[in-house]
Each structure stands twice: as C-alpha cells, then as structure tokens.
UniProtKB/Swiss-Prot annotation:
One of its GO terms (cellular component) is chloroplast stroma. It catalyses: N(6)-carboxybiotinyl-L-lysyl-[protein] + acetyl-CoA = N(6)-biotinyl-L-lysyl-[protein] + malonyl-CoA. It is an enzyme of class 2 (transferase). This is Acetyl-coenzyme A carboxylase carboxyl transferase subunit beta, chloroplastic. Residues 184-203 are annotated as: Disordered. Its main location: plastid. A zinc finger (C4-type) spans 225-247. Zn(2+) binds at residues 225, 228, 244, 247. PROSITE patterns: COA_CT_NTER. Pathway: Lipid metabolism; malonyl-CoA biosynthesis; malonyl-CoA from acetyl-CoA: step 1/1. Belongs to the AccD/PCCB family.
C-alpha cells in the first residue's frame, strides 16, 4: 500500500512573529514578541501585530515537496498547514475533527519505538520534531480541503510569494478582500468555502461571517498599491507622500495633500472657492442627474470642483498654483475648472508671479459638451498672454493620469514640463486607441519614462525632491524668497 512521509511540528510556544522581524528568516522556529501586550491574551481579541509570517520565501524550499505541519498559538488553537510544492498548493485548516485525528496520530507516533530509538528535534524552538507515516486512503486533500480563515488572515498576513515565488499580491484573496470591498457574504450560517487562483496555484479559503465583518470593518485603514498590490497603512501613507513603501510607486494624491506638500505652512490663500457648476447644458442621465453627481462628489471630497487654485509661498517664494484633483469626477475639466484656472493665470500675470499647475485629469467633462472643450482654448489664450506678453514663468507638473484635453492644452504648454515617475500620460487612453484603430498599444508606451526618452518633457522628479527642484528653478528665473528680495533692494 502506498504510503507518504510527512513532517509534523508542534511549536512549544505560540505561533508568533512581529511585523518587524527580530530574527533571521532562515530559522523556522517561532519568534517571541518582546513587547507583548497582556490584553492580547484574551482569546477573542486578534491583532495583526501579534503574528506575522510563517515562513520566508527562501525557507519553503528547505522542505520536501509534500509536507503537513501542525502548529498551535498561545490560545491553544491548533492549525494544520499543508504544502505541496510540486503542485503549488498551500492550505491551512483549523477543522477540529481533523486536528483531533492528526494530534492522536501525532501522540501515538511520539510514543512509538521509532521515537524511542533516538530521534529528537535539534531546533530548541520546537517542542518536538518528528516524521510519521499516514495511509493515503484517508486522502489528505479531503481532510485539508479548506484554507486559512480570516482570523489567520488578519494575524499572519500571508505572503502569496510563498505560493507563487513572486512578490505580486494581485490575485491574493486576502488583499482583494481588504482592498476591493467586494461582497463576501455567504448563505451558509456557519461559514463557506471559497477557491481562488494565485499565479496558477489553488488556494482555498474558509470564511466565517464574523471574519467577513472584521475584514469590512478595517478595510478603510489600508490603501492598495496599483503597481505591486501591496497594502500600505493609510495613517502612515501621507507622511510618506503617498509613495508605496514596498515598491516605491507614486500613488494618487488629493489636491489638498499636494498643496500641503508644496506650499509653506500658513501661506496658502485659496481663490474662487465658492464657484460651482450650474449644469449649463442641462445634461440628464438615466442613472444619475449631473447636478446630483456633482453634489455627491462635493460631499465625498469636500471640494466644490476638480481643481483648487490660490496663492502661496514655496520656500518663501510667492507663487500662483492650481492643483487638479482626480478624486473629483476623474479630474475632468468643465466650465468651472477652466474658469478657475484662467482667473489664476490672469491674477499671476497681474501680480508678476510664477505659475504652477499640477495636472491630474481624464480630460474634458462630457456632461458639459462643447463648453468643456472651449476651456482648452480659453486657458491656452490666457497662457499666451502670460508667457509671451508678460514674459513670466510657467511650470507644468504632470501626474498620473494626465490625459485628454488637459494633455492637449495647458498640460504641455509649460516653460518647464515636469512629470512624476511612472505617471500615465496620454491624449487617448489605451482602450480607446485599441478599440478605434484595432491595434494593440505597446505596454509602457504611455508611461512617463518612455515619453521622456522621446523628448516630451524636461524632467522626471520624485515627490520628495519636487519642492526643492521647483525652488531652484524659480531662483534660476529670478524669483526669490521675499526676505532675500527685500534685502537685495536695500
């Protein structure tokens, strides 16, 4: 009869790793939490700071191709962990009936003659380390037919690279559940089973209604990276300038955050804050009227329109600045956006101020028809007077995404054009081009790095350097901080 060898481990202490690892991942044993909170000993309180990774990616290849591990946490809850490297299967289960059978076999084998003949685990972190034989008639796949539930998801933060050998989290159930907000409710009272694919690997998740509620409850605390699909804690993301701490990708920023990044504290003076759209062409949609949609975005973002304009100081240098906000109807340019930017340019021309416009837009706003298209010409006309007649300095900053009418007008009219790393910059989007021309758009052909090589703009500047770069550019063009300017006049 065919038999299989398995490794089984029963940890002496709780299954525990902190997010900041304080032991080499080369060792498989549990790591003690030196800053343990006594409140965490309560059985029904879970914390992601309590447990982190089970294994590092490099550890997984130290095991044979078909392994099962038995682990126990500080609450006495046991879990079986099953690896099938050859078939790329990773499953975790806390099925009590199966675990009882496993522990029974484990205990019987521990007292067997094989163990008494001298086999001992060498790792001091294990209570025991052993191998035992198990008849395949019981079918391990049937016993371990469900994987980690949300309790372990919130504590272990499973790295899908264990399964796929890559650093991508894109198809992970855990990350989808936290970030997408998709409905995970089940008609079953006690829980349900969900199977997903992760880079060609089968992953079965056992869910419970309480776990799903926890997932939805804390979803708002995280922001998922568009590039690596890793999770970034929202509370810390702002201090990191909305740059992914895992891959360095520049995530979208609100207009208020950009103003805070560029403008000196206490110097911001907004303009035309009370200007709102009145639905000039009375655009009506069966799904949602235009005015209702405007109202919903105003409540959601706290803004009146898709751009903020005003006067402020950048390292002491007075500047006029307009910042578009993609969160407000995709940063689309309607009559109010066009009017606010035009007034900003005219005010900068009258006050002899350098001008900055931060672009983040999907283009002209279709709900306002040709009036939105006319904003392109109106803004370009105001810039013509500002740049050629007044001989003043305009810096255009292109962020992701900058497309459509904004790209075709003031986005590309800067005396200096700066792009953020990996910014998506185009006139027509990839999908529109492919559907119109029936041609495939090459991957990366609308990214900032590729367009920079083609000479489309002057600089690619990371966010952490942007303010200092702008300051040097203004000084180069004879715009100095107020205190330096007054001292030179004296």
């Amino acid at each position: 009869m065919e038999r299989w060898w398995f490794n089984s481990m029963l940890f002496k202490k709780e299954f525990e790793r902190r997010c900041g690892l304080n032991k080499s991942m080369g060792s498989l044993g549990p790591i003690e939490n030196t800053s343990e909170d006594p409140n965490l000993k309560m059985k029904n309180i879970h914390s992601c700071s309590n447990v982190d990774y089970l294994f590092g990616v490099k550890d997984i290849w130290n095991f044979i191709s078909d392994d099962t591990f038995l682990v126990s946490d500080r609450n006495g809850d046991s879990y079986s962990i099953y690896f099938d490297i050859e078939n790329q299967i990773f499953e975790v289960d806390n099925d009590h009936s199966f675990l009882s059978e496993l522990e029974s076999s484990f205990s019987s084998y521990r007292n067997s003659s094989y163990l008494n003949n001298g086999f001992r685990g060498e790792d001091p972190y294990y209570n025991s380390y052993m191998s035992y034989m198990y008849d395949t008639q019981y079918s391990w796949n049937n016993h371990i037919n469900s994987c980690i539930d949300n309790y372990l998801q919130s504590q272990i933060c499973i790295d899908t690279s264990i399964i796929s050998g890559s650093e991508s989290y894109g198809d992970s159930y855990i990350y989808r559940a936290i970030c997408s907000g998709e409905s995970l409710n089940s008609s079953e009272n006690e829980g349900s089973s969900r199977r997903t694919r992760t880079k060609g690997s089968d992953l079965t998740i056992r869910e419970s209604s309480n776990d799903l509620e926890v997932t939805q409850k804390y979803k708002h605390l995280w922001v998922q990276c568009e590039n690596c699909y890793g999770l970034n804690y929202k509370k810390f993301l702002k201090s990191k300038m909305n740059i992914c701490e895992q891959c360095g990708y520049h995530l979208k920023m609100s207009s208020s955050d950009r103003i805070e990044l560029l403008i000196d504290p206490g110097t911001w003076d907004p303009m035309d804050e009370d200007m709102v759209s009145l639905d000039p062409i009375e655009f009506h949609s069966e799904e949602e009227p235009y005015k209702d949609r405007i109202d919903s975005y105003q409540r959601k973002t706290g803004l009146t329109e898709a751009v903020q304009t005003g006067i402020g100081q950048l390292n002491g240098i007075p500047v006029a600045i307009g910042v578009m906000d993609f969160q407000f109807m995709g940063g689309s340019m309607g009559s109010v956006v066009g009017e606010k930017i035009t007034r900003l340019i005219e005010h900068a021309a009258n006050q002899n101020l350098p001008l900055i416009i931060v672009c983040a837009s999907g283009g002209a706003r279709m709900q306002e028809g040709s009036l939105s298209l006319m904003q392109m010409a109106k803004i370009s006309s105001a810039l013509y007077d500002y740049q050629l007649n007044k001989k003043l300095f305009y810096v255009s900053i292109l962020t992701s995404p900058t497309t459509g009418g904004v790209t075709a007008s003031f986005g590309m009219l800067g005396d200096i054009i700066i792009a953020e790393p990996n910014a998506y910059i185009a006139f027509a989007g990839k999908r529109v081009i492919e559907q119109t021309l029936n041609k495939t758009v090459p991957e990366g052909s609308q990214a900032a790095e590729y367009l920079f090589q083609k000479g489309l703009f002057d600089l690619i500047v990371p966010r952490n350097l942007l303010k200092s770069v702008l300051s040097e550019l203004f000084k180069l063009h004879a715009f100095f901080p107020l205190n330096q300017k007054s001292s030179k006049i004296k």
